[in-house]
C-alpha cells in the first residue's frame, strides 16, 4: 500500500539528505508529521540551548534510523528550527522506511 504522505529524500555522494523542522520543549521525542513540502517535523523534549537541541536531534535520529550518531550530520540550520541533515550510511529508501515506521 502506498502512503499518501509524500516526502522527498535525496541520495548524495554518500547516504541521504533530509530536511527537518525541530519543535523543542515537547512532552516526548517523536516524529510528529511530514509537512507538505517534505520536511520532517520532529518534536524533542530539549529545553536548553540550540547546541544541546542539535545533539538531542542527532541522538534521536540515530535511534530512529538505527545508525551511530557519528553517521548523522547537520549540514545547514544549526542555529534555527529548520535543518538539512545527511545520513552517511543509509540510502534514501532505507531512511524513508525507518522514518515512516516511527511516524506518530
Stretches found by the model and what they are:
Residues 1-59, 73-78, 83-104:
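Contiguous, often N-terminal, cationic amphipathic patches that form binding interfaces
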Residues 62:
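The alpha-helix within a helix-turn-helix
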Residues 69-71:
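Short acidic capping loops at alpha-helix termini that bridge into adjacent secondary structure
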